[in-house]
């Protein structure tokens, strides 16, 4: 064995662990010194105002204390937090700053948390059910000590069952040739060829085998088959993973195969479905179970007596009795543990749970024949060495193309701490030790193809059973635009939906993307998709909090988490919000390619990505994702949602609430009132010059070319140019004729109709699009005369460069972020708003040439021609005056009251109304007002009565509790005085 290699490796790992440990301690210290308790709770590292709800004795005599939120009730839950089983926590009294005790968190649910305290705190820890406490997450000394101990053991390891394995893993020797094994009879007959090959390969290898399982390829199924085949050969297997969830997943699968399995770890840390296989449960079924139970009961009784007595001599006797009982308990439990371990075919534990500090210290050094480490790519290499030293062979399973091990120290991560054992061996030995599973059973083929090309060298394929499945194929789900596509990109580029800039730059948020997510989820739910089948993934905790505030009340089953919380999970639909949108093009946390791979591959049937393409395209890997979605998916711009989302930096004219009765409209908008958000998005596409392309459609001459096409003016566009000229000729002929209207056939495509809309606008004609689906058609008609102008529209003269409008640029492919012919969506939208404003002003000026006897009110009712149709010599000052006058008039339909002196501004639609119509429920903003009130209540957690202030009266329950506490205290003082008085009387 190359001792120098071992020594240098151990020295490097210890140095990296020390950096990580120091960074973790410094982070905790900084939080405690510079953050308030509420800030710590918002960070997820502190739980406030807890009460003791129960105490009992657990395994090895540990004291288990259950804490719950102070206010009891069915709806009271713990706040969002980052506590997990195994965390070291500090216990504090709410009214004191000193720490009462240190314990290990063994179980946490939405409503309670259980902490285990060792025997050293038994007599110092006196917890009162009436008091309130807080728990603070501390740096995990236990894990650090176990990792350090394993590395030091490796350094001193000279002879033993793992000697050859250590040589191979540290580069002292090459892997031995595979041995010949007889043909296998598989327990699982549905394994695909790549899975069967991986099983045979793992069993044939002498020292090490790596099973590379990309998302959805059945890695756990393959690992279970390997374990069963090893047990069949008479081998003793130790199976580990870095997390309790991963270990419990294997326990559930192995339990179905009726093998003797034993799960190490306290049952409070395990899933309920596997607790029967825990060491504690097995011991409870053993011959010594009743004796052990009697000893524990005796310990609890002695604790009770010790708590009641005040005599020091009796307390000392009780302590000695407890020590003797614990000694007997330990001896009987160890004998039962050895018996249980020997009877098991497979022993399962976390990496750190397999240390010599636990039950495995009772077994011989060479007891196990093979060690299996699942999810190895997520584990620190130092943690893997804890179980690896217990057997001559190891089988590693995982995916090093997904999330790496979690670290706090950026310096340690760059120096190699975040590089897993699996990744290091795969790069060093390649195919000699690695077999990859090539068929996935989760994702639609469009999702699979991107992951395969981006991360897995094109080797990953979709099984036919999932290759074409979509959301619309689920029971009860309708066929809509959202449910019929596997890939959807909502691009916020140029829409003003910028990220929130935090001072500490620790986390980012994007309220605009939150609103887009909300609208898309509502569209999916309206189509019949269950909220529990949808996941929202964000890379930043601040964005996760914003999403939960907006969505959790309405959709409680909806899962909203960070990327790290979703590895190993899957959902029918996944919505990704990338958050980053800034002028510098900084992507920050998104630069981790493996993080994006995990996020995208959580979806089975539908992935929606919401991002700013201008920002994310500055990162090469993210640009490949955007380009792929553009080529194979459906692309929308956030402008399609402008009826529901208005960027904060837009003026109020752009927010035309569809809940109000419409004012006269300019011709760029449809004359029909939108019946749904989907229809309003279609109108927005027509107004901004965008049409969408579904992945199944080929780019034809009459359709917009996909973004990836480079033939903007080539032969592929000839057909589109010819059709435009054909439509232009038809409209010119109509203008020259005396016909009142021109109807176009229903056979026109959506883009053909867009061309007709644009041409009609050029000629100053009225253009209406009516009908639904295949019955949709366009009618072009003449406008009413404006002022003294002619009723016959004139063909437009060629515009000068200064007058040129951006409409002809609509042929530019959608979504290209760079290029000289880039279509500026924001400029188009602002121009549309300007035209709408001009239309409104013209409606105020249009009656100037009518007889004086006509009433002024009558003139305001009649819509006039658009601003674009006004003569070029129109007095600009008059136009401005008209706009100002319109702005000082009540925005409610059929109301001409002035709002110059007495008017109210509506925060929901950004308009002014007179006192008769200023209430949101009257002028059409009632729903928005109710939504705002709900959001405020959800955010502040306080229900306000009208516009009054918060009721600061003492809560009746709290008052009653304090009264009971006072009465109890008075009773105790009274009894003490009575007893002293009696003693005094006896003395006399």
UniProtKB/Swiss-Prot annotation:
Tissue: Expressed in liver, skin, muscle, heart, brain, spleen and kidney.
Region of interest: Disordered: 651-722, 765-820, 835-872, 943-988
GO biological process per UniProt: negative regulation of transcription by RNA polymerase II; neuromuscular process; spinal cord motor neuron differentiation
GO molecular function: 5'-3' DNA helicase activity; 5'-3' RNA helicase activity; ATP binding; ATP hydrolysis activity; ATP-dependent activity, acting on DNA; ATP-dependent activity, acting on RNA; DNA binding; double-stranded DNA helicase activity
EC primary class: hydrolase
UniProt protein name: DNA-binding protein SMUBP-2
Substrates-to-products reaction catalysed: ATP + H2O = ADP + phosphate + H(+)
EC assignment: 3.6.4.12, 3.6.4.13
Domain characteristics, as noted in the entry: The R3H domain recognizes phosphorylated 5'-ends of single-stranded nucleic acids which promotes binding of nucleic acids and stimulates ATPase activity.
Family to which this protein belongs: Belongs to the DNA2/NAM7 helicase family.
Gene Ontology CC terms: axon; cytoplasm; growth cone; neuronal cell body; nucleus; perinuclear region of cytoplasm; ribonucleoprotein complex
InterPro entries: AAA+_ATPase, AN1-like_Znf, Coronavir_polyprotein_1ab, DNA2/NAM7-like_C, DNA2/NAM7_AAA_11, Helicase_ATP-bd, P-loop_NTPase, R3H_dom
Alphabetical list of PANTHER family matching this protein: DNA-BINDING PROTEIN SMUBP-2, DNA2/NAM7 HELICASE FAMILY MEMBER
Function description: 5' to 3' helicase that unwinds RNA and DNA duplexes in an ATP-dependent reaction. Specific to 5'-phosphorylated single-stranded guanine-rich sequences. May play a role in RNA metabolism, ribosome biogenesis or initiation of translation. May play a role in regulation of transcription. Interacts with tRNA-Tyr.
SS DNA-binding: annotated span: 637-783
Subcellular localization(s) per the UniProt record: Nucleus; Cytoplasm; Cell projection, Axon
Motif (Nuclear localization signal): 857-861
Predominant place of localization: nucleus
Domain R3H: residue ranges: 721-784
A UniProt-annotated Pfam family: SMUBP-2_HCS1_1B
UniProt modified residues of type N-acetylalanine: 2
Presence of the UniProt keyword Flavoprotein in the record: no
Binding site for Zn(2+) 2: 906, 909, 923, 925
Oligomer status and interactors: Homooligomer. Interacts with RUVBL1. Interacts with RUVBL2. Interacts with GTF3C1. Interacts with ABT1. Interacts with ribosomes.
Organism: Rattus norvegicus (Rat)
Low complexity composition-biased segments: 802-817
